[in-house]
């Protein structure tokens, strides 16, 4: 989404520039691509400082628009992945270190969801529904299909709190991590932040598929980050199956709008995969029975007007669990 680098929503252009300069020095033809869920690609490049940062460099900014159907295996079957990403001689995957209310963190593996073209992303959110683990397995399969040669995660200025959109808080972490394995990079960053690697669903999915064993060799400075603020997360399903919907509705944190910030731009209801958002001339409204808690609306809100909030019963139960 369109954002300035200091918001810590997008990868900083100078990190991407450094990778591009290296590739150019090695004789590469460099294309910088993405498929934004929201906003014009040109506006993202302008607002994010990419156009200015890359002045004078022989690179091509090219939005992913054409897909190729790839069979990524059961239960997903065929998925449309950006043709340019699949046909490139080498893919350098450059992600932002930021929190994610649904998937815990956005790191190297999840970043490749950007290779799903445009509005096909909500379709896969909806197909995965409330199953966080299934969505993680989807992301791991996409990673395997794209098979990046190098993954870099920009955490020089990262995001903590209720990310991944403007509801999160920028924090200077001074972290720049990279490696030939996105799984290894993600595991190392989790440990650096003080989190068990299994808390990141894509790590767990990759381990179950025997794509990583969490044994990571780290070269360079590796100091832990103190007091990193992770997103509040609730299990999306719990209790007896017949009660899943009602328990999720009343206990799991939900997206909510700040009327003072909301400009009724329409991005949230246009992008909502579950079609759970409606609006009138004064406000947006949420159907929490339909809402799958993917928090896409929060991520795409250009005003930072949407946040994940705890329900009152959810707060009570969380406090009881913390005191026992």
Enumerate the predicted regions with their spans.
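Extended, alpha-helix-rich binding/interface surfaces that flank or overlap catalytic cores
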Residues: 292-293
